[in-house]
Amino acid sequence: MPGSPARGAAMGGGPRGLRKTWTELLAGRVKKQKYDPEREQKLKDSALKLLRYHQNMHDLLLEVEEPQCKRLRLSELIDRDSADASSDRSASFIRSAFRDQASRLGVPVGVLSAKVFARSVQQVCVEPSHPVLLSPEQSKKLSSLLMIARHLLAQNMFSRLTFCQELWKAQNSLLLEAMWRLHTHSVVSLQELLQSHPDSEAMAMWLFRNLRSLCEQIGASCPSPDTTEAMLSGLVQLLISRGFQGSSDPRRLVEPERLPQVATDVLQRMLAFSLDTLEADPQTTLDCQAVSGWIPIYSGHTCCGVVTENSLKSFFSHTLTQILTHKPVLKVSDAIQMQKEWSFAKTHHLLTDLHCRVLATLGPEESVGRLQEVLEMQEVNWQHVLSCVSTLVVCFPEAQQLVKGWVASLMARAFESYHLDSMVTAFLIVRQATLEGPYVFPSYADWFKESFGSSHGYHSCSKKTLVFLFKFLSDLVPWEAPRYMQVHIFHPPLVPSKYHSLLTDYISLAKTRLADLKVSLENVGLYEDLSSPGDIAERESQAVQDVKKAIMVFEQTGKIPMPVLEASIFRRPYYVSHFLPTLLAPRVLPEVPDPRVALIETLKRADKIPSSIYDAYRKACASAEKQQPENATSAQRTEADCAKEPLGLLTAALEELRALMTDPTQYSVISAQVAVVSEKLNAVLGHRNDGGSLQRAKIQLSVLPSTLQKQDQAVVDLLLTAFCQNLMAASSFVPPERQSPWAVLFVRTLCGHVLLPAVLTRLRQLLRHQGQSLSTSHVLGLAALAVHLGECRSMLPEVDPDVLAPSAGSLCVPDFLNSLLTCRTRDSLLFCMNFCTAAVSYCLCKFSALRNCLSPGLIKKFQFVVLRLFPEARAPCAPEHAACVPWRPLYLPSADWQRAALSLWRRDSFQELLKDKEFYLTYRDWVQLELEIQPEADVLSDMERHDFHQWAIYERYLPAPTALGGCGGDLEEACTVLVSEIMDFHQSSRSYNHSEDSDLVLGGRTGNKDILSRLQEIALDLELDQGSAVPHGCSTPQSHFLFRVFRRRLQALARPDSMATSLRRQQELLTCKRLLLCLPPSVLVGGPQAGQPISPNCGEFFSLVNSELRNFCCHGSVLTSDITIHFFRGLLRVCLRSQDPALVANQTLTECQTKCPVILTSALLWWSSLEPVLCGRWMRCYQSPLPRELRRLQEAREFASNFASASASPAPSPAWIAAAALHFAWRGVRKEDVTAHLQRLDCQREELLIALFFFSLMGLLSSYLTQRDTAEHLKAVDICAEVLTCLERRKVSWLVLFQLTEKDAKLGHLLHLAPDQHTRLLPLAFYSLLSCFSEGAAVREAAFLHVAVDMYLKLLQLFVDGETRLQGHSESQGSPVQLITKARVFLLQLIPQCPKQCFSNMTELLAGRGDCDPEVSNALRQRQQADPSFDLYQEPQLF
């Protein structure tokens, strides 16, 4: 024992102050004595007897588990009861000790043990380290005491009542956990403990204080949460079951009424404490922690199975009433002014959590009924009432109709009995519900118009109802926000004309109030929404919002927003005083103009910015650039720091939402948390939220890969990451079809913000450029997001994905997301498979139909990928029947995407889907997708790709009927589709790097050569089939399918009325030419049938050359070498197949002279490349000279080459061929040599000189258009001048070249030798040669004045149309304005010198064109009407 004298002796002093231990003293005696079992038993009995008569029971119990006690403990005796025979002696010792003690004291043993045990428990709880919880050491001691107590209870040696009474004597030192341990170890129950307390009030206070401390520990995340939560749950169950038990409960007849009163009092105190704490707006106080720990008890799961349903309903109904009526100190006027601060998002999250839990247990219908009852019968706390209404409509969509019905009944009652309270209640509830946005409740403006804007409104019964309404609205004026008065003014109630004074009186009152508040109706913002819940913004801040919105709309549309245009006219004061100063705020202008600069410049050009204001703005910007603020960096840093706080709140809200995903019991509060996320998102975006994307007709995205601001990208990445994490968390518990509607709510939140374009931009970056680097969770999450965006497609605007290619048109969101998935390379194709597999699987699991959720293009891409990657999918297979589509394996870490894709392909549900034509992969779809493939980065090898093409074309699509997207066995149809899709691909934004001289490698890639090879193979098969199967008696061969495709596509493109259209048409023609070069050359010539020596059918090719290629694919007066050589190769091939090759060649080339002469001039230019091919093949095949027409071309070339020599042969016929050859020969000759050649022109025929002058004019115009070399231009001018001099010297009229028409029998064919642009620019050539005209030519030829005036008027029209604009002008060329000035002076000097007969047809010439130059026109008319002696100038100087 602690006071043993032997121990003190053993520890006494020794010779050197050292004391021996008891063991050391007995060491020697132990060795000397022999072991005697009988003596050992006697010693043990003597020791027990000594303890029995000298034991202090209180000290004994406290001694249990003392660390310093090395002797046998009481707990150890109990622990060994079942282990050895000494357990009976241990139990006997405990009982004997208490019996002996009770016998000496004369008290019952149960009372003694209870008192001793109570004092021991109190001693354990002394000096607690925690208000309600035991320390680890205290817990161990109490565990041993509980074991002793249970042993005594089993022997009927323990009085529970006495124990409880003894405990309460020192209640201030008792710990709640000790009481709980007594209850859980069945020593005494909580009910017994509470029932035995002598003072109900004191017991209630003690329990309230301990519950609050316990909740503080729960809210602060204590180290033993299981214990604390079990304690709180058990106590609450007891309080609810005893405080709200029904009167039919038989226990109420035998139990006193004191415990129910205490239970009710404690619950009310805790709720009142929570409401008071939340009203004080706590942050991180202990009271707030206590409230956060207490709120979760308001859940039906807490008392499930323990408390009866009636008791639970009674408790929650009582709780809702207490919430609504807690401290009703706010007046109605206070509620009208303050209710905007009580919206769901602005209310403390713990209070909304409390509302949500209570309302969820009661149900929407009962909750609305309880609200009605409380509002009618009691005074209420308007803050709690209105915040409860917000929670009701936000968290319980089914309650929205109930609230609308409630409001309707209140309004009907108000106007029936003129009940003002009902009117007040209805308006407050409506305004509160509208604070939550249009997705929850109609806007206040819409409700007000619906209620009072028609003849069926509540107020339309009588004059008394009108007076009642306007009296009520007038009473609201001093208290309500300006926003509501504006709604009443802009959307007034419908009032009969005889009572119109009531309305005007109210409007006057409201306008006066608005004026007092300094809110002007004229200064309402351009984009201000009268239905929004916020206050009227200051004009400056509203102007800032208007400017931001205007810039955003301008950036999307490229046009001045209509509200800005209207404001510049009808709301001039606001526009000039507020909008323009905000828009034109001085700043350092960016090097690359941003949308703000572009909008300002557009407004300036439209005269919407006064010059003085604009000049001041430019000067201020220049000053700002010179005085660059040094603190710009710090200002940006401050702005970034300010943005971090709302972003952190948004992150926290998203984390709370993810936590709810993993708890199925919390699904009821998910919608509330999504609303919190929406509010935090609004805070991050600031004023940029425009109330929803529904107001936008189209979203226009930039083509640049990184156009997001840093904050926007951070927010978007946060939202997308949260969505993916939420999906994985929710799917780890339940499949998609059993999940809560969190995803729909989340996506609607994204759709309702101005951030939606940023979300779509980020999705484009991720799916198009970073798809292969995304993890499995990201792929699954983004695929599910795409599905839900498709579900919301009706409420989303269309997307214009490319501002550089507006002709592509806008896309709905599902089609836009589908356009982001490409199949060009191995990585992109595999990512496309993964994404499509995830999206289709999720959609089939989540919904019953795919029609509204996914783009048909995505389904088709999935088919394309599966058929391409898996040969086993190409063979018919029996569909797999399963209860559901396999979604769960996809979100496992080791997802086998290929196996999942094949499994989905074989599912009967998916195969059933493919029976719908909308989702079936047709031949045209297959070609479009296959054109995207880049063979060098393809997942298939060359042989595998070839086999796949052969299977797809010849086994799948060629024999398939056209109704199923096939070709119906028609090779021509297969070729037509290939050609059309190749051309579409070449014109689309998927292809780039076009150049006129490049091969048909679409998009600058080699990926299309395989498809071109398939086209060549099919075209060759088609040519063989058509050659061997000619209809009997058919003399006119059918047109080639290729020209039919070209003709149809070119007709679809309008004539080039703009530069963009012209370029598109030119690009289309380049594609046509390249396809012609890829196919056999016989396509150009057509070819006679076997055994028929007739001319081949070249009409379609001639028509294409004359109408299209001559204008867009032509170098001056010739076609390009490739198409020219290709034509002659085709001609040779047709000749080789005919009976008389020379006849076919001669007839074809003779036809070219009249129908398509540009082919012959092209052959002359490229003769050096063409002659070896023609001569070599002709000699090898026929061993005979060239046909006559080919020799004519050969002779023309020889004539041009030997023109300067004395032995030059005479010019061959026709003269224009010789002239063309001569003109082309001079291209490569130096200027000095050309002069020598020109001296020999006098001996040539007139026809040759006229044609040569025409070709020289075309060369001059080509030098103007190309602008490559000034020397070449001077050379061209010299040639024209020399030829013109020769013509005038020989007195050959050349004016006819400037008046050519196709009906001209002699020279009309020359118009087919040059592009139309060159012939339109002949006036430019005419006056470029002004200095070359001889002095007498003007007077000598009567037609000269007519031609000169006509050319001048046409030159003016060319200048007006912009066709004289050149990239640069050399000094020798001069500018178009200078040329027009010279021409004008020339005419004004020429007109007086011309004889009267020169003006005979001048009236017709000036008809409709006289206003182009009034001075010239007047001079012509006066000279025409003047006498012969009349003269304007005595001595004209023409040159």
Curated annotation (Swiss-Prot):
Which tissues is it found in, per the record?
Mainly expressed in testis and lymphoid tissues like thymus, lymph nodes, and spleen, and at lower levels in kidney and ovary.
Q: Its principal location?
A: nucleus
Q: Is Cell cycle tagged as a keyword?
A: no
Give the transmembrane region(s): none
Q: Which UniProt keywords apply?
A: Cytoplasm, DNA damage, DNA repair, Nucleus, Phosphoprotein
The species this protein belongs to is Mus musculus (Mouse)
Q: Give GO BP annotations, semicolon-separated.
A: female gonad development; interstrand cross-link repair; male gonad development; male meiotic nuclear division; regulation of CD40 signaling pathway; regulation of germ cell proliferation; regulation of inflammatory response; regulation of regulatory T cell differentiation
Q: Where in the cell is it found?
A: Nucleus; Cytoplasm
Spell out the GO cellular component terms annotated for this protein, sorted alphabetically and separated by semicolons: chromatin; cytoplasm; Fanconi anaemia nuclear complex; nucleoplasm
Its job:
DNA repair protein that may operate in a postreplication repair or a cell cycle checkpoint function. May be involved in interstrand DNA cross-link repair and in the maintenance of normal chromosome stability.
Q: How is it modified after translation?
A: Phosphorylated primarily on serine residues. Phosphorylation is required for the formation of the nuclear complex.
Quaternary structure, per UniProt, is: Belongs to the multisubunit FA complex composed of FANCA, FANCB, FANCC, FANCE, FANCF, FANCG, FANCL/PHF9 and FANCM. In complex with FANCF, FANCG and FANCL, but not with FANCC, nor FANCE, interacts with HES1; this interaction may be essential for the stability and nuclear localization of FA core complex proteins. The complex with FANCC and FANCG may also include EIF2AK2 and HSP70. Interacts with FAAP20; interaction is direct.
Name listed for the protein in its UniProt record: Fanconi anemia group A protein homolog
